Amino acid sequence: MSKDTTTYQGVTEIGSVPAYLVLADGRTFTGFGFGAIGTTLGEAVFTTAMTGYQETMTDPSYHRQIVVATAPQIGNTGWNDEDNESRDGKIWVAGLVIRDLAARVSNWRATTSLQQEMAGQGIVGIGGIDTRALVRHLRNEGSIAAGIFSGADAQRPVEELVEIVKNQPAMTGANLSVEVSADETYVIEAEGEERHTVVAYDLGIKQNTPRRFSARGVRTVIVPAETPFEDIKQYNPSGVFISNGPGDPAAADVMVDIVREVLEADIPFFGICFGNQILGRAFGMETYKLKFGHRGINVPVKNHITGKIDITAQNHGFALKGEAGQEFETDFGTAIVTHTCLNDGVVEGIALKSGRAYSVQYHPEAAAGPNDASPLFDQFVELMDADAQKKGA
């Protein structure tokens, strides 16, 4: 393995620290450590996004996951103060696996390097990996428990490292949204004239979501995961929103019950990603774990109501069971599977035929990613407008 001798101020020389990526099935990859040096454990998943690594790494939906980048070189644009998707700039990925770490930062907005930011936040990374071989393995065998071991930790017997990896908690059955949610309620005010107030449940919300609402004149009250429905009534919301987030939706029973209360109260509802799975469960649908998930910023999705195809940003390892255009009865009226992925037919959106509640599995807030699906926010505002007119507000 060739060694890059470029040095970042205050961090480890690139290529100087041996490291291993160890999978639970015993497969091991040799590389070099960067960022923090030590051990990290998580579920190994891959993203096909060619840009936006900062947005990916600060997305709370990646909590407890080691992210493998398929793009061959990472770090070119450094790190800046504007593109974080977590509220406090926290990196949520458990670790980062790459082929080549850029030796120089080349972006006018950069305030530091990827290497420096990871070291500062204690995030362990490994480079010099044959990521093509690794991604093929994950594609064929599925996402798997993994660990990155660098420095002194990499000197332990591989058999011992494999056992450490195997003994970590599984993603299936994990209720992780409470681990990434805000501790207290906070508010993002509307830009210009305030049209509506939305209560947004933070299950791992990305910061571009309230920005999308704010730009449309919507005041967003962001509440912690599992906040009782009775507690949000004080805000007199025009609508309720459920965000993206990590973990297994089958373990989120409290949030499912809350959404059922929202629907029973006939309050307009919109959900994305984890929120889509929660709405589906409230409708009586089942969820399952995908083999290797959808993670990227160019995933094609078909809207079976309009026939339109959107290119979407996605990050999910679980999905709802259903088929394109499927109609079914719920406690709240007839529902329909509105969207599916053109790559594999996975359910990407559901709605009540009345239009009062809808959700999508992908990320219309587009950070990073295309803006094809941003009209979903306009749709929610129009739904709240119509509801206000009906109620004579």
UniProtKB/Swiss-Prot annotation:
Keywords annotated in UniProt: Amino-acid biosynthesis, Arginine biosynthesis, ATP-binding, Glutamine amidotransferase, Ligase, Nucleotide-binding, Pyrimidine biosynthesis
Gene3D superfamilies, A to Z: 3.40.50.880, Carbamoyl-phosphate synthase small subunit, N-terminal domain
Iron-sulfur among keywords: no
Active site: C273 (nucleophile), H363, E365
HAMAP family (alphabetical): CPSase_S_chain
Protein family according to the UniProt entry: Belongs to the CarA family.
Quaternary context: Composed of two chains; the small (or glutamine) chain promotes the hydrolysis of glutamine to ammonia, which is used by the large (or ammonia) chain to synthesize carbamoyl phosphate. Tetramer of heterodimers (alpha,beta)4.
Record-given protein name: Carbamoyl phosphate synthase small chain
Annotated source species: Corynebacterium glutamicum (strain ATCC 13032 / DSM 20300 / JCM 1318 / BCRC 11384 / CCUG 27702 / LMG 3730 / NBRC 12168 / NCIMB 10025 / NRRL B-2784 / 534)
Taxonomic classification: Bacteria, Bacillati, Actinomycetota, Actinomycetes, Mycobacteriales
